[in-house]
Structure formats: structure tokens, C-alpha cells
Design a protein with these regions (language model features):
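Membrane-anchoring hydrophobic helices of lipid-metabolizing enzymes
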Residues: 1-93, 99-110, 136, 140-144
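Long, hydrophobic, well-ordered secondary-structure blocks that form the structural core
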Residues: 96-156
Length: 156
């Protein structure tokens, strides 16, 4: 099997991140979204923080972890993770969730896994949700793989 056929939809590898970060940083639409989401921090500081991330986990810890815990504190009664059925924290596992909130649910699971010293999740996300090129890049930095919803039979 030629795995390169999945290059356009798989999560980025860590060695690809510097180039992707530079592409995101140079994108005016991403700049606008980032400064809108984090208005009290100059964009150049956000860019510097991105450039310091060497792995996808570094990125998740630097940008996603704190934001997700703030959302949880402000909008939930709390988060818990019973991982007693997981015998080996160093192995990969498959988690199955409903389609209630594909991004937030997996984000909450990831921060709980980080707190247990475990690896974060990869998620499938439909390309119908990726309305701008910078969003497609950002979700792949955040360990998502893209489900292409409008493929022809020949492309499948």
C-alpha cells in the first residue's frame, strides 16, 4: 500500500510543522482569526509561541490545553476520566464517541489524557467543516485526519 496517497488528509508529522506554522503565520485570514480568538496577545507573540512548538503535543499543550480547561471550568460541572480499564498508558487505544460535538468532546478527552501522561487523540473531521485553507492546516496540526465527503466512486 502506498501511504503517500493519504498525504492530503492525514495529520501532519512533527517534522512538517515548521513549514506549516510559517504558512499559517503568513496567512492574513489566520492572523485575523488568531487575533480575534486571543485579542490581548500580539500576533507576533502567538507566532513566536507557534514556532517554539516542535511536536503536535507541544502545540496542543501550548495552545489548546489551557483554553479547553477554561471552557470546561466556565461551562461544565467538571471533567473526569476513569482510565482504570486501560492497562498500559504507553499504548494506543481506540475511543468511540457519539457525534454530539466532534471537536470539543475529543479536546476534553485529550486534556484529560495529557493529565494522565497519555498521548492525545486523533480525530476524523469532515471536509465540509473546513471552510478555509488555514482551518484545514490547523486541524491537521491538531492531529485530525480529514474525511473527504464528496468523493466520486472513482476517487474512493
Amino acid at each position: 500500500m502506498d501511504l503517500t496517497e493519504f498525504n492530503e488528509i492525514r495529520p501532519y508529522n512533527d517534522e512538517e510543522l515548521p513549514q506549516i506554522f510559517e504558512e499559517l503565520i503568513a496567512d492574513p485570514a489566520f492572523q485575523k482569526a488568531a487575533t480575534g480568538a486571543i485579542p490581548n496577545v500580539p500576533f507576533e507573540l502567538l507566532a513566536q509561541k507557534m514556532r517554539a512548538c516542535k511536536t503536535k503535543l507541544d502545540f496542543q499543550e501550548a495552545f489548546c490545553y489551557g483554553i479547553l480547561w477554561k471552557i470546561a471550568a466556565d461551562h461544565t460541572a467538571g471533567l473526569t476520566l476513569d482510565h482504570t480499564a486501560i492497562p498500559d498508558k504507553s499504548k494506543a487505544y481506540t475511543y468511540i464517541s457519539n457525534h454530539r460535538d466532534i471537536i470539543l468532546d475529543s479536546g476534553f478527552l485529550s486534556i484529560l489524557l495529557i493529565d494522565q501522561g497519555m498521548d492525545t487523540v486523533e480525530i476524523a473531521i469532515g471536509d465540509n467543516l473546513l471552510i478555509y485553507p488555514w482551518i484545514k492546516k490547523l486541524v491537521r496540526v491538531n492531529k485530525s485526519f480529514i474525511v473527504q465527503r464528496a468523493l466520486t466512486m472513482r476517487q474512493m
